[in-house]
């Protein structure tokens, strides 16, 4: 046990008892007040209210874990409402068993349950008592210690990698300046941490970035979703089968999290031994559901989840209405279904991630990587620096504070690293700005059948699929009905296009031209014949297609392969010969940064690169880019802040003098930090191999 942890232990016990006494007193006072204002609730005197408060606390402690074990799926799918309803029934029974008290109707018990939760939350907040912190430091500590190693205090320090999905370095710096991330700002101002930017690959999205960061390779990941001609299948990154295939192709067994690490809420595992809510591992986990059970085992968590979910839905509906009322542009449609999806990512998945990371720290995992997806989801639909997106960012910042404070009391010492996998760029969508989709543009130029985009644009469906899949180990009647037709092996796949992503119905679209969108990046597959169609073949078959694409104002450049000149980046006013560097006319890659040619040339060598890769145009004056999907904030291609994620890390860690360009490069940096802390020899050999490969590439 670390000396710091040992010194804090007596204070924590005092805080625990104090918090329990305050909670019982507040509950008793609320019960007595409720009896005065609610018809149907009778309490003879304050003493009986105090007895009832103690009885309710004891009943929750003894009965709730058993109840929630059976009611878990319904509690999760109703955002905590079902658990709230069950606890009201518990209150109804307990109060009616005490002499001198009476509840005449269930609805009265429901109101009382709400009042007790609300007053406890308000009073604890006013007294500066963090209920979350109390729960994380006490309940989770006891659970995790059962599996912890007694020698952890002498172990090498571990690292907690906390990813904020989709947050660009410039946005992060402005958030620090403007007070939107006070916890992270405090780290920087104290000198304990420093902030650096890095540049991701052309495919500036999670599967390419996380595969590179966690496994050290993102070769042949051209976009978030792509088509493989030789097998006639679609690979969709947030589909369990697609994510598992990505990991199979890139894992060598010695990823960033190998050797006892934990992967929480990621797309790939990084070869972690412990996983939850990790899309590539959904088919393989025999213990799915235990993290949900741990989260909902505390009735306070259920009430809090329900209240926070309702508040988040309300905030979303209000923010969407305000954008319409004020005619804020750019904007996209945001309906009730999205508000429910947002509540899952912003509230439930965030808080479960906090709980599991803290449990990992108390269990002494050597390295943990967890993704927090809430900001990315809201920024897609609202905008990268709109107030509701920044509000979600503040919530993530608070969550990181809880993790850090809890980690300080863990037996193993920990270093905390906060990073992002890519940024986002903002702008009016291609459709809203030009009145047509990329699919329609290709259809008009080719005068041939084009497959309609079946996949939708919301990445959060993958996270929701992971969330529901974690429940299927406890599948019952309700889940059977809800998930019918969405099974993919042992996992559940929700959202548009799940059939094609699972390999069903592919024959029906095999011969169609396929136009796929990945934010500001488009992929055009002109046929299903294996191999890439060349510029000369395209011009012979579809003579109007290339001219129509490059002359469109919404398209910055296209990538094609010429039989004579090799890979070419072609824009409206010039051509960039990628192998030789020769420029004809105006370089179409000029607005996309000094490393654009390097990124595009590398992608051109991928086995599954599309016949035509299309990058949206970037306005250097307004820093705007138009997505080929209906997203205000987007990523996936070149242009603007989507290419510039960040790393916030302990000042004692070294940072390369040269720019960090590519997720694979960042992987080498992170592995180097583990090496410097003294992690296992296999990782050291892995780092040496990576450095040799980088030097010869």
Regions found by a protein language model. Give the residues of each.
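Juxtamembrane/disordered regions of integral membrane proteins
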Residues: 2-111, 121-131
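Active-site-proximal N-terminal segment of extracellular/periplasmic enzymes that hydrolyze or transfer
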Residues: 132-192, 432-433
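His/Asp/Glu-rich, glycine-adjacent segments
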Residues: 134, 216-383, 519-526, 531-532, ...
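Beta-strand elements within well-structured catalytic alpha/beta cores of enzymes
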Residues: 153-173, 213, 367-373, 393-396, ...
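Short, structured active-site-proximal loop/turn typified by the sulfatase FGly-forming signature C/S-X-P-X-R
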Residues: 174-211, 216-220
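Active-site neighborhoods of enzymes that stabilize oxyanions during catalysis
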Residues: 231, 238-252, 260, 264-271, ...
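A long, amphipathic alpha-helix that forms part
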Residues: 347-348, 375-416, 440-450, 543-544
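Metal-dependent active-site segment of extracytoplasmic phospho-/sulfohydrolases and closely related
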Residues: 397-435, 567-570, 575
